[in-house]
Amino acid sequence: MARKGLNKKYPCEKDGIVSRQRLNDIAKELFRKSIHVCSAFIPLFLQFMRLPVLFALTAALVLYSIAEFMRLKGKSIPLVSAVTAAAARKRDENRFVLGPVTLCAGIILAALLFEPFAASIGIYALAFGDGLASLAGKLFGKIKIPLTQGKTVAGSLTCFAAIFVSCFLVCYNAKIALCVASVGMFIELLPLKDLDNLFIPLVLGLVAQSLY
């Protein structure tokens, strides 16, 4: 009888474990994407202190890379290692967490290669489009898109809307915003993993500058 009782409880316990794992995944995604969203302040800072901001981003990229190599060798770096552990996904376990590197590199390259308005569009697309798409997919994504490694309709539509709005508020041109948002949504669908942090600001910055 006791054995039967345990068997009856097992599905509930399993559901509880799955729920906790999902909540943990959502919490990590919220933390990760809050960093993405904070990058929306970069275009404003670039207007007033361009060189110091670019220097700070480059220094952050280098210091983070050093900290990650040390972490992989078993040496913990105060604050940096804690932030990495809080943001790391399952696929990042025991690996160099590349996301912050590509995030900084994408922003730096966009700022260096494009006019300020185009760089801003690319950076905002990264901050809001990519940032909110993943959250929407985790929270509301029930319909999966085939051949996209788990991307969802909710995430893609959120990406499109966020890029369209942020682009329009920079250029006040609906056609450009529509084109940029469409390209951004397509990039978001590709299985680029952390490399989307590079492709989104660079490709969308180029599209915006070409069309404006």
What is each stretch, according to the model?
Residues A2-P146, K151-Y212:
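Hydrophobic alpha-helical transmembrane segments
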